[in-house]
């Protein structure tokens, strides 16, 4: 699919400060972000041509479950997913500010499971680290910060290639699960930084809302519920399904098969349909098809 050229006219910025570097910088940044978004859209349009038979993903809603430690609730899933063949995991800590402390925590956990862990922030060449990785784990934190770092380091296409073409196992937790999907449009996080595009890795053809929270019928809080926000997202045209993963749940994707695992169920939102409940063990393989609808 070849998209036509997109011509963007950057509007003149309001005079909020003296003319000078700020205006030029802001206009330049806006133009670059718009052009990057167009490039990402063209890249996404080609995704359907990539074979998915080798794809292996473990998409976890949350890293820590109430009453437990870091990755405790899913550690057996991780061990079964990686198996004995993988010896070391490449960790991507970009979602948190303190990457050193984050990598230390992740390393201690994976070493307790029998795996080595190298953090990508310690590498002089992040792209080369991805190309050599036996497995990739992207941790949680702020999804906007994470996606911006992936774009800034030129890692979107290298990670896609390793996972979709080379069959390298991918583990995502929270924000790491968000960026595995088509876009981060349904994240819960604040946009504290601005990635060039909301389009993400596109390892699956739908969106996920990690930490999905059911409405509290006894609450007096007047803010929008998670469900209302997702329904607002689906008021926009051509928006993909959204899988609300409750804390304690995870999605295992092997090739063209997707299965809900963990301790809790999930809630599925498909544009134009009522939300549906799904228990652990549910088969979500139909979501992996382009233009997925209810089975």
Model-derived segments and spans:
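Short glycine-rich anion-binding loops that position phosphate/pyrophosphate groups of nucleotides
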Residues: 63, 141-144, 176, 213
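Catalytic-core regions built around general acid/base machinery
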Residues: 153-167
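Glycine/threonine-rich flexible loop motifs
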Residues: 143-153, 219
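Short internal beta-strands
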Residues: 90-93, 208
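C-terminal and late-domain segments of enzyme folds
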Residues: 2, 48-85, 97-104, 108, ...
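A glycine-rich, hydrophobic loop/mini-helix early in the fold
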Residues: 92-93, 97-143
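Catalytic nucleophile loop
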Residues: 137-140, 163-183
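N-terminal chloroplast transit peptides
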Residues: 1-33
């Amino acid at each position: 699919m070849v998209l036509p050229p997109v011509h963007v006219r950057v509007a003149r910025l309001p005079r909020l400060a003296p003319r000078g570097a700020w205006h030029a910088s802001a206009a330049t940044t806006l133009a670059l972000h718009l052009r990057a978004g167009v490039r990402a859209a063209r890249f996404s349009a080609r995704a359907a041509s990539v074979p998915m038979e080798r794809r292996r993903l473990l998409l976890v809603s949350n890293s820590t479950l109430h009453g437990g430690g870091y990755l405790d609730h899913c550690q057996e899933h991780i061990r079964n997913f990686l198996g004995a063949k993988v010896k070391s995991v490449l960790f991507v800590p970009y979602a948190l500010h303190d990457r050193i402390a984050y990598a230390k925590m992740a390393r201690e956990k994976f070493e307790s499971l029998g795996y080595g862990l190298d953090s990508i922030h310690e590498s002089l060449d992040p792209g080369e680290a991805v190309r050599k990785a036996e497995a990739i784990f992207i941790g949680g934190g702020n999804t906007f910060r994470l996606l911006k770092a992936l774009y800034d380091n030129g890692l979107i296409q290298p990670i896609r290639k390793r996972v979709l073409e080379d069959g390298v196992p991918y583990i995502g937790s929270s924000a790491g699960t968000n960026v595995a999907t088509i876009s981060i449009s349904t994240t819960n996080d604040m946009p504290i930084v601005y990635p060039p595009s909301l389009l993400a890795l596109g390892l699956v053809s739908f969106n996920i809302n990690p930490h999905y929270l059911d409405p509290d019928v006894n609450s007096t809080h007047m803010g929008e519920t998670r469900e209302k926000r997702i329904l607002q997202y689906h008021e926009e045209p051509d928006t993909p399904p959204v899988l609300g993963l409750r804390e304690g749940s995870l999605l295992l994707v092997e090739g063209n098969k997707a299965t809900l695992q963990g301790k809790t169920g999930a809630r599925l939102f498909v544009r134009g349909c009522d939300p549906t409940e799904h228990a652990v063990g549910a088969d979500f393989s139909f979501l992996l098809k382009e233009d997925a609808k209810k089975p």
